[in-house]
Amino acid sequence: MTDADTLSKLTRINGRYGMFHRLTAEADTGDADFLFSAKDNLVSKDFETTAGSRILEGYHPVFDATPIARMRGAGGMLIGKTNMDEFGFGTFSANSAFEVPKNPFDTDRSCGGSSGGSACAAAVIDDHVSLGVSTGGSICCPASFCGVYGIAPTYGRVSRYGLVDYGNSLDKVGLLAADPAKLGRYMRVIAGRDERDPTSCAQPDFEMTNCRIEAVAVPDEAVENVSADVSRAFESALESLQSMGVEIERVSMPELKYAMPAYYVLAASEASTNLARYVGMRYGKQDGDLTQGFDEYFTSIRSRYFGEEVKRRVLLGTYTRMAGFRDRYYAKALQVRMLIIDAYRKQFRTHDAVLTPTMPFVSPRFEDISEMSPIETYKADCLTVPPNLAGAPHLSCPCGYDENCMPIGMQFVTDHWREDLLLNMAEDWGKSFDVRRPEVLI
């Protein structure tokens, strides 16, 4: 299925786009039925796993994350681990400690993040599927920027065993592909209970149905602050959906504006506890001065090998969990999360899905990203954070292009455990929308 020539092509396109942190050295897939890649925060026994961080450089796991194991069990061959924002902290994959993946439609622009390498691989490698991970938008954002389909399932639908955690109550393993049919095909593979991940054990069985999205709610708040290009593409997509028989209703969901601050409190709080394990002893870098005391040694390792965004979020999360601040911030953020969930549930009583643009703008240039403040970067996630905070399944589909041929996506959100509606929509939309592909080299 692949040979030395194919491996050479993979190496060459990786030099152009930088989507892989590590590529397979095997020139023959043997009996593999399909090829796939995985975000570098899913551990794999034959690839270094770094989660985009120097502090994990040199970490070689002895087991596969459950989603990778299930893909391999279905006949797949893992061809590489994809570049990402360090520990998933970012919107543009520009916070990688290694190589920053480049957008396949314009290499001066971002792939999105934090699963940017996975989206790029899905876009430029023909007949490919990639495992991604979403915490606050890390599947749908890069799917939108790279013009592919991306699905983040219900929280708990796919096992997180073997995932380098960002936020335990937020992380979801999903899929990215240029062919929407692959999302349904491989969601059947990776979904399901796993005794090693208790959060996956309460789910109903994953079943595909013939049910379709027939009515969608479009929140006014979600289209107020998007760019003109995104607005035009989204409105055109609404017209196309109506021609497919989908009923469109404009609604108000004022609760959505509270999702961002609540998300960053919860995500940073959980991240700061998860990252406490990286101290230069059990995983990755272990080159500190062993004559130092524990505090000095840990501080030295973390200061040298954590990136600036990681340090920022650790400090933020530690602050929100401090005595005297926990009730003021963390507990209140949990209450806001329930408000967001209730707001979605209200819409799902009369609609099959909530529909918004995926991102408020097209992929920015790296030179513009470097000028953004942290707050401006965080605000870019305003449309992808709400469904992630609610733990609801969501799908990004390509829906248009700007004057520079940069992709624009739209995001469907359905009720918990209703991935079937999203997967059917992806296939239906794929038959009616003329998707443009970048130069496919493999």
Can you annotate each of these PLM segments?
Residues I55-Y59, D171-A178, G317-M322, F412-V413:
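Short, well-ordered beta-strand elements within core beta-sheets of diverse protein domains
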Residues T6, K39, L183, V216, ...:
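Residue-level signal for inorganic ion chemistry
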Residues R72-R188, A390-C399, M406-G409:
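Short glycine/serine-rich loop segments
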Residues M1-H60, D64-A65, F87-G90, T199-A202, ...:
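Short, well-ordered alpha-helical
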